[in-house]
Amino acid sequence: MRRTRTLLLLALTAFSAVFTPSVSAAGWDDVYTSRLGASASYLEAKLALKTAELAYDGYAKAYIPTLSFSTTTNTALNIGSDGFSSGVLTPSLTLENILGSDLALKAPLMASSSSGTLGFGDPSLSLTRKLFVETVADRLDAEAAVFSAQAAVRNAEKAMSLALARDILNAKYYGSLLEENNKNLAILEKVRGATKDTIAIRELDKRILQAKKAILVATNALADVTDDVKLNIDALNSDVLGMRDTWTTPIDDIAPTSSLEIHALECSLEAAKRRQTFSILPYLPNPSVTASLSYNLDKNTLDWGFSFSLSYDAIDKGERALNAYKRQEYPQIIALKLESARKNLADGVRKIQENLELLKLDRQIQDLTIADAKDAADLMARLYSGGFISEENYVIAQIDLAVETINGQKIDFDILLQKLNLASYYGAGQ
């Protein structure tokens, strides 16, 4: 009976192993994309970018027409208790921002139930523009808005990639720290229980407290690690270490001199200078001028005309003076912002490079420290094998080597994070 039960259990176990779907660990791309999708600032930046691109396309792609349908109060589509009676629907094909003008083609479609007719009204072609236009400045402002929106998206992506890389490397480091110190604590406590020498006991107690502190620090740090990293740490760590060469390839000795933010300010400055040249415009009336051609279908004649529309405040409360003053001042303001942005870019790169130099020196020092610890551990191992030293001295030497090795790993991780941060200035990274 027991044999039958055992065979059944083995069969069920095999069945479960075959038919239980395997769950593959999520990699960098999966977690990174998931985090971006859950970031309100990133999603908002993407939306702002689409808005800015659409506004800019109004100038850059003026050749793309818009098609609209409209009615007026006098030509509304009328439907009553007797059904449809009459109405005029006017399709309009418009090209906007053609050298500051709008070109529109209209062909009214008229319907009447009383006469039972459906036909076209007189087609017309019109060209409308303001008397004074600033199309170039408007386009530069729209282009600046695109660059600014692109910068916001890029900054959100940069912050997310650096945060994820930091989470992964910290999780790996603190995981190793916790594992090593748990192992060290068990050995230290075992040796402590067998030690009689008072001075040695004091040193062991100190080491035990240090191990407990390291365990507490690592435990608290790992408690802050999110599940998306914690559950996939091995795959994520492998991805980060595998992609670091790709991410840091663009880094060279020549510091970047521009960025999306700087491009945006350069466009804004050029637009502001153009508006400054026409700072008198707020004081001038700016009528809309329309030139039109229409074809009279009944008379088979071509008619033309010009029209002007105007709205002008002869007396205001200072709005025009303020607008003119802004046109005078904005070039200087934007120029100062541009200078500051260039300085911030250079300073940002310089500070990261300085941090990298310090970390590289730390790593060289740590290499020497590890070499010393390894030599000491090897010596203690030989002395312990020969019975010349106590077990506690041997154990402490081995623990010192393990601790220094982990400290070296932490410096390596810090160097990688600084390189990823620097690479983002060169347009590298995710």
Region annotations inferred by a language model:
Residues 36-41, 53-66, 91-119, 124-141, ...:
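A glycine-/polar-enriched beta->alpha junction
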Residues 83-89, 117-123, 300-306:
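Residues that define the transmembrane beta-barrel architecture of outer-membrane proteins
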Residues 23-90, 143, 197-201, 205, ...:
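Bacterial Sec-pathway N-terminal export signals of envelope proteins
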Residues 1-9, 26, 30, 135, ...:
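Periplasmic alpha-helical coiled-coil/stalk elements that build and connect Gram-negative outer-membrane
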Residues 73-77, 109-113, 131, 293-299, ...:
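Transmembrane beta-strands of outer-membrane beta-barrel pores
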Residues 323-329, 333-368:
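C-terminal structural cap/anchor segments
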Residues 9-18:
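Bacterial N-terminal signal peptides
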